[in-house]
Amino acid sequence: MGKEAKTNAMRILERAKVAYTAHEYPHEEGVAVDGVTVAASIGEDPACVYKTLVTQGNSKNYFVFVIPVAAELDLKAAARSVGEKSVAMIHVADINKVTGYVRGGCSPVGMKKQYTTVFDESVLSQPKVYGSGGRIGTQVCCAPADLIKAARATTAKIIF
């Protein structure tokens, strides 16, 4: 990665002894890029590039869901996977306050607090998985099982 500073997500992966590679992609400073564009920018199939979504349940607890960038979260299935009656996406303005990350740079690893985290089960069929490196412009790639373990996550069918 050269002289670029490591993110909290990268430091956590290293402490967990997870082998990963970091991949930079072009972007305007502070401007989020959609996941399908990110996949194209790093030359990868969108099926192996995952996005991190943050929700709040009817209990007022926060939950993190990680799904392929071209997929849509099934809110009912997501709620069932965490034992909630319902979940709703948090407002974009609350992302930093809740996670410590910015929109477009939200990693499932290294948030301010450890939230219940669920990856879509499709991740298990991927030989490698990309997720945000913890800032806009950086993706990390590693084995799916390693990212799931580092995020202290489970898996479930949570997309349509």
Residue positions per predicted region:
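Extended, low-hydrophobicity, polar/charged segments
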Residues: 1-160
